[in-house]
From Swiss-Prot:
This is Acetyl-coenzyme A carboxylase carboxyl transferase subunit beta. It is found in: Cytoplasm. It comes from Streptococcus thermophilus (strain ATCC BAA-491 / LMD-9). One of its GO terms (cellular component) is acetyl-CoA carboxylase complex. Keywords: ATP-binding, Cytoplasm, Fatty acid biosynthesis, Fatty acid metabolism, Lipid biosynthesis, Lipid metabolism, Metal-binding, Nucleotide-binding, Transferase, Zinc, Zinc-finger. It catalyses: N(6)-carboxybiotinyl-L-lysyl-[protein] + acetyl-CoA = N(6)-biotinyl-L-lysyl-[protein] + malonyl-CoA. Pfam families: Carboxyl_trans, Zn_ribbon_ACC. Acetyl-CoA carboxylase is a heterohexamer composed of biotin carboxyl carrier protein (AccB), biotin carboxylase (AccC) and two subunits each of ACCase subunit alpha (AccA) and ACCase subunit beta (AccD). It comes from the Bacteria.
Length: 288
């Protein structure tokens, strides 16, 4: 050290090691997913305290969950049989990077597309079932999503089954352009055929349900349920405010606001959904 060099005023330590009783130890690693920040109360919540239903113990905020987690919560154990798994996503517009994004999302989520379709029983009531997963490109609706849901309604007509759909979506998939928008009319036509057959269609709106999904099959159910505080809408809040040049209510596009104005039949806690759906299916001549 030179004559005029300053001594450091701190001690250098290795953040990955610590010494106790003269023995060097590695610092235990804390798993990244040990805690979750609640968007409702802004508190750090121990993951185990959220429970299987993923509901904040402090403010009852309902976290988003995957399609698999939804299945585990809703259907009878071992009853789910997946349908229409072999449909491949194409890139009709040759949208740059689309196929790479799909491949990365498939690897991350373990899903082939943004919706899981099949048949299952809920508390003994048999139903055709679709669950959208916002982890897959925000459950945007492309041609495969449209095809799977359409086929589900066609299957339900043949088997004389009700249809239950858990919606969650950011809207039409922009990478597929007009092909994605066409799915709105395609699914709506299938819903109408199912209705003409005298069969029940029940939707459960989960956070978020927006865009083309809201403008089509999400709001066409004979019975429309929603989870608490679900974001439901077509255009974004700022787009609407800039268009109508008015300030919207704070709870605008929330499930509670829509129920108050007649667009949602009931808001049901996640832990009560399976029982509620089963009861509604039984009222409408459920199949066992």
């Amino acid at each position: 050290m030179g004559l005029f060099d300053r001594k450091e005023k701190y001690i250098r330590i290795n953040p990955n090691r610590y010494v106790r009783n003269g023995v060097d130890h590695p610092v235990p690693e804390v798993p990244d997913d040990l805690f979750a920040k609640c968007p409702g109360c802004k508190q750090a919540i121990y993951q185990k305290d959220l429970g299987q239903a993923k509901i904040c113990p402090n403010c009852s905020y309902t976290f988003r969950i995957s399609a698999k987690e939804r299945l585990d919560l809703t259907v009878d154990e071992g009853s789910f049989q997946e349908l229409f798994t072999g449909i491949k996503t194409e890139n009709p517009l040759n949208f740059p990077g689309y196929m790479e994004k799909l491949a990365a999302t498939k690897e991350k989520t373990g899903l082939d597309e943004a919706v899981v379709t099949g048949v299952a029983t809920i508390k003994g009531q048999k139903t055709a079932l679709a669950i959208m997963d916002s982890n897959f490109i925000m459950a945007s609706m492309g041609t495969v999503v449209g095809e799977k849901i359409t086929k589900l309604f066609e299957y339900a007509i043949l088997e004389k089954l009700p249809v239950v759909i858990f919606t969650a979506s950011g809207g039409a998939r922009m990478q597929e352009g007009i092909m994605s928008l066409m799915q709105m009319a395609k699914i709506s036509a299938a819903v109408k055929c199912h209705s003409n057959a005298g069969l029940l269609y029940l939707t459960v709106l989960t956070d978020p349900t927006t865009g083309g999904v809201t403008a089509s099959f999400a709001m066409q159910g004979d019975i429309i349920l929603a989870e608490p505080q679900t974001l439901i809408g077509f255009a974004g809040r700022r787009v609407i405010e800039n268009t109508v040049r008015e300030t919207l209510p704070d709870d605008f596009q929330k499930a509670e606001f829509l129920q108050e104005h007649g667009f949602v039949d009931a808001i049901v806690k996640r832990t009560e959904l399976a029982d509620t759906i089963a009861t509604l299916l039984s009222f409408h001549g459920g199949v066992q």
